[in-house]
């Protein structure tokens, strides 16, 4: 009986840890949040830097599939470099990253729409050729 209760407690604890780490990793996609962390000295704390290294497991497909903001993995990778962490103290650096993300999303959206249109046209041609 006690073993079953302990197992349920472990499962609940693991689920909570998963949710908290998922939320935190996704916050790393926000350059303004990274600037906030840098200005408050989090990136100078060796334990915090080690935690960022630990979080690299989110790059594995079995975990990455839960991410809504995959660019957070790129930021997590960049945060492994001390030079990048130091640059984030500068608000202009965060602003630049933010602008680059917006440009990427705009370009990606347009490119994706064109690709979907081309695939739909190709499928329509294949359907009419098959009749």
Swiss-Prot record:
One protein family per Pfam: Med31
Residues that span the membrane, as ranges: none
Alphabetical UniProt keywords: Acetylation, Activator, Nucleus, Transcription, Transcription regulation
Compartment(s) where it occurs, according to its Swiss-Prot or TrEMBL record: Nucleus
GO biological process annotation, one example: negative regulation of fibroblast proliferation
Listed GO MF terms: transcription coregulator activity; ubiquitin protein ligase activity
Domain of life: Eukaryota
Residues bearing PTM N-acetylalanine: 2
Keyword Transferase on entry: no
CC terms in the record's Gene Ontology section: core mediator complex; mediator complex; nucleoplasm; nucleus; ubiquitin ligase complex
The protein's assembly and partners: Component of the Mediator complex, which is composed of MED1, MED4, MED6, MED7, MED8, MED9, MED10, MED11, MED12, MED13, MED13L, MED14, MED15, MED16, MED17, MED18, MED19, MED20, MED21, MED22, MED23, MED24, MED25, MED26, MED27, MED29, MED30, MED31, CCNC, CDK8 and CDC2L6/CDK11. The MED12, MED13, CCNC and CDK8 subunits form a distinct module termed the CDK8 module. Mediator containing the CDK8 module is less active than Mediator lacking this module in supporting transcriptional activation.
Annotated PANTHER family: MEDIATOR OF RNA POLYMERASE II TRANSCRIPTION SUBUNIT 31
Job description of the protein: Component of the Mediator complex, a coactivator involved in the regulated transcription of nearly all RNA polymerase II-dependent genes. Mediator functions as a bridge to convey information from gene-specific regulatory proteins to the basal RNA polymerase II transcription machinery. Mediator is recruited to promoters by direct interactions with regulatory proteins and serves as a scaffold for the assembly of a functional preinitiation complex with RNA polymerase II and the general transcription factors.
Protein name: Mediator of RNA polymerase II transcription subunit 31
Organism: Mus musculus
